[in-house]
Amino acid sequence: MPRFIAPDIRIHASFLDAMKEFVEEGADERSLLLHEMEEFGGTWHRPEVFAAYVERLNAEPLEETPRIEGWVPSTTLWYVEGETFLGRLAIRHRLNPFLRELGGHIGYAVRPTARRQGHATAMLAASLPVARAIGLASVLVTCDTTNVPSRKVIEAAGGVLEDQRGGKLRYWVGTDG
């Protein structure tokens, strides 16, 4: 049964396979995934680089962790079944101006070969108690106006549409279940 885990080096091979799928599909130019691919993609195959990447992801929730200027603390969770990487989800602990307009508190991605199986819906639902534990009573979740599957995922989680900005639909989702 799929579940969330903290990023873990044991998922290395499946993670690499998933990243190949995302590359073949073409990652969104504004996505965290693309940013990470540009930074690590050519070297993720090296165990020491992947271990450093995993260590960095697991340090991101800490306020004192060095990060790119303007970036906020975040909790990254990997959605796996056994040692198969199915997707990832990031919970940003607070909003900066960019996240308030376009990015939101929660971003998620399901690897292309695992889509249309209910994983995104399960991931978003399972992330809400985690967001609540971080101290977020409600979270902003956004999607492209043209991304009907993601819109349905957000609405299934109880998302209430606030408005549309910059090609994004902006929903608020309560974390109290």
Model-found features: residue ranges?
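Conserved acetyl-CoA-binding loop-helix of GNAT-fold acetyltransferases
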Residues: 107-110, 116-133, 151-156
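Conserved GNAT acetyl-CoA-binding A-motif
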Residues: 131-142
